[in-house]
């Protein structure tokens, strides 16, 4: 029985230098133009058009506590409507924008997990991937300037464009999060693995074919090892992102600086690693801070298996 529900509002972790999820040594790379804030501004929390009482709590003001008018019993549900504005920082992390891409991830109020230990209310930490969420179905309508191309969790089921804006209707089933990336510089390459459409979003032609090949090989190898990739699309997205790679359902971000011959091996490693997270994080969920062996350790082992399968055991052992 619940008298309150909690949601993560991760953008508030970016509102000042004391709370941002970066180590001090990362600040210059995260904010090449100097620190500027990001946040989420909650305008209203409603149930059946009635205002609900709420409070913003947590070490970084990144937890939304919503008080229920009546107790919510096991098996019951409640509809909560949220109105809010989000400001993205000029930041080259998961959440923010750079010269090439707009990275919109961990951006909306997402329900905290209630498990056998109770509510999980940990703030956005600087170390590791501090995310923990249940699977949900998303139906999203996204309006964006027409000059941008869109990489997204889910399938675009409808697209209406006029001279200035494009309205996307997106459907994403059984995913733990919803992320999207926009750019007016993307070139898109496509291929298929069985019934899976694989998209690679590139910011230049360097290594674009290699990115396609690695994405397809990864889906192939991991599907044979761990069971079929469970979605219809998969997108590998070159991004203004200094941390290497980051996984989201049906979509991974890859540091655009890796797309060159000098970093060819590292690019393959990062794409394969992030693809493995589609099984170890996306399919098999876990609390990534307290149980990292369930996502990072298994993903790292899976990456070794990828190189063994593709190039032989000697390469995998390296």
Name each region found by the language model.
Residues 308-318:
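Zinc-dependent metallohydrolase catalytic domains
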Residues 62-66, 78, 166:
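Short strand-edge motifs at loop-to-beta-strand transitions and within beta-strands
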Residues 114-115, 129-272, 300-304, 313:
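Hydrophobic helix-coil surface modules that form long, contiguous segments used
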Residues 28-44, 79-181:
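Extended, low-hydrophobicity, Ser/Thr/Pro/Gly-biased non-transmembrane segments
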Residues 275-291, 305:
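Catalytic Zn2+-binding segment of zinc metalloproteases
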Residues 2-13, 18:
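Ligand-binding face of N-terminal immunoglobulin V-set domains in extracellular IgSF glycoproteins
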Residues 21-46, 51-73, 253-270:
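Aromatic/His-enriched, Gly/Pro-containing loop or helix-boundary segments
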């Amino acid at each position: 029985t619940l008298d309150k529900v909690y949601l993560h509002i991760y953008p508030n972790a970016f509102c000042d230098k004391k709370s941002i999820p970066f180590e001090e040594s990362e600040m210059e790379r995260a904010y090449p133009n100097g620190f500027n804030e990001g946040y989420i501004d909650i305008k209203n929390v409603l149930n059946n058009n009635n205002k609900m009482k709420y409070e913003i709590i947590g070490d970084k003001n990144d937890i939304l506590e919503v008080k229920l008018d009546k107790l919510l019993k096991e098996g019951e549900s409640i509809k909560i409507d949220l109105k809010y504005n989000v400001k993205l920082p000029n930041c080259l992390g998961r959440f923010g924008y750079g010269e090439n891409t707009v990275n919109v991830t961990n951006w909306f109020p997402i329900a905290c997990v209630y498990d056998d230990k109770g509510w999980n209310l940990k703030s956005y930490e600087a170390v590791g991937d501090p995310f923990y969420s249940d699977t949900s179905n998303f139906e999203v309508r996204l309006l964006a300037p027409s000059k941008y191309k869109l990489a997204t969790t889910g399938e675009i089921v409808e697209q209406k464009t006029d001279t200035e804006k494009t309205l996307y209707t997106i459907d994403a089933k059984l995913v733990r999060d919803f992320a999207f990336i926009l750019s007016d510089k993307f070139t898109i390459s496509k291929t298929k693995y069985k019934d899976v459409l694989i998209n690679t979003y590139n910011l230049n032609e360097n290594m674009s074919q290699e990115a396609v090949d690695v994405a397809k090989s990864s889906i192939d190898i991991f599907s044979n090892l761990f069971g079929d990739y469970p979605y219809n699309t998969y997108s590998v997205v070159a991004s203004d992102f200094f941390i290497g790679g980051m996984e989201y359902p049906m979509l991974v971000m890859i540091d655009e600086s890796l797309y060159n011959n000098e970093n060819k091996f590292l690019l393959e490693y990062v794409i394969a690693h992030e693809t493995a997270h589609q099984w170890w994080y996306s399919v098999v969920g876990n609390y990534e801070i307290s149980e990292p062996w369930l996502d990072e350790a298994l993903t790292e082992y899976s990456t070794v298996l990828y190189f063994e399968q593709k190039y032989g055991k000697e390469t995998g052992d390296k």
